[in-house]
């Protein structure tokens, strides 16, 4: 009888990527099939995030619900992974002793062995260590799930912003070897993937070892990925202003596959607050990066992250942030009221900002961003945009849904054969969360660039012989 696996995922795109790898790993090693019904699952895994407020309590509430299932089904395996597991592993083991497996983001590749061990062991099996790049060396070959794919190119963060737990839960920055990244993307391209989103906590800090001992920069990696035939759209997230050098800006000038949309977190427009956050840049330095980007790619749209009501934030500090939002003219944002993360320096900062003031500031910020976003959408009316067809429209299954490079969803009438292809659309209507358009041309009339076929890239990638000796064919 086939064993069933349920994975519940909270948090960032990196967690989504990790969860997909858990499913592939347990499917390949143990034949587990995914289910969405916890009652029929043999293994329940919770992939956690510690960024949001009350993350720990949210975990224990979910585990409490799963405990009722385990009481009725003693052989049920419950596992907790992700950043909360790394941060609170011992506490989880003490407060929820019925949890069988506790693993960190860097040890998910050991899940099959840990689950087997838990079945013959009454004690919780826990591994929240940081074995650097070992995780990627032990994952199964990638499986495409649609026309877009996430590919993790580096892990961790070495910036230590005062409010952030990532360096403590995912470790220091570690980059995957260049040929491993290219090999994974080439495999995905062979399976029909057209768009790749490169992932990392500080993705533009990538410094990947090459087969000859040199180091590949993030800018060079972008150009190499874009040259793979079939990969006609390239994104990356999340980037850091400190690592956004002129070499990356130059890629926007010469690499059309790189989208005209960038998520570049700034957190605040006040230099005083940025210093308290230990963000190694000023508001002017951030705007300088944006000016260079818009010179290289005039139509680029920018999104960002903002923390409102950071301890000590005055009304002037907040208005500095609002000025930055208007000056840069952000298209989107992820914005939240500050909430202290246990173990971070900012958790000990005194904060006397009234709760209503926090809510009012967040509402004002989000209203301004929404106003700007709506204006950008209206400006797209009667223009022609290239979009990747992702599947049927969620509003009307008789229509298709495509995504533009500036992250707008466009619904249009077209043949299902267009799914997985690029189309040019004339934008006819603008709504709050989407656009509507009509088909202008299909991919066969576009002349998309062909540089290196996926099979050629795979053949050029490092391989190991029976003795474990690695060779690389340049």
UniProtKB/Swiss-Prot annotation:
Cofactor dependency: [4Fe-4S] cluster
Signal peptide range: none
Cofactor details (free text): Binds 2 [4Fe-4S] clusters. One cluster is coordinated with 3 cysteines and an exchangeable S-adenosyl-L-methionine.
Catalytic activity: N(6)-dimethylallyladenosine(37) in tRNA + (sulfur carrier)-SH + AH2 + 2 S-adenosyl-L-methionine = 2-methylsulfanyl-N(6)-dimethylallyladenosine(37) in tRNA + (sulfur carrier)-H + 5'-deoxyadenosine + L-methionine + A + S-adenosyl-L-homocysteine + 2 H(+)
InterPro entries from the UniProt entry: Elp3/MiaA/NifB-like_rSAM (IPR006638), Methylthiotransferase (IPR005839), Methylthiotransferase_CS (IPR020612), Methylthiotransferase_N (IPR013848), Methylthiotransferase_N_sf (IPR038135), MiaB_methiolase (IPR006463), rSAM (IPR007197), rSAM_horseshoe (IPR023404)
Domain TRAM intervals: 378-441
Domain of life where this protein originates: Bacteria
Domain Radical SAM core: start-end pairs: 143-375
Entry-linked CDD domains: Radical_SAM
Key word NADP present: no
Residues given in the record as [4Fe-4S] cluster 2 binding sites: 157, 161, 164
Listed EC numbers: 2.8.4.3
Residues in MTTase N-terminal domain copies: 3-120
Keywords: 4Fe-4S, Cytoplasm, Iron, Iron-sulfur, Metal-binding, S-adenosyl-L-methionine, Transferase, tRNA processing
UniProt similarity note: Belongs to the methylthiotransferase family. MiaB subfamily.
Oligomeric form and interacting partners: Monomer.
NCBIfam families given in the database record: miaB-methiolase, MiaB/RimO family radical SAM methylthiotransferase
Name listed for the protein in its UniProt record: tRNA-2-methylthio-N(6)-dimethylallyladenosine synthase
Native organism: Aliivibrio salmonicida (strain LFI1238) (Vibrio salmonicida (strain LFI1238))
Gene name linked to the record: miaB
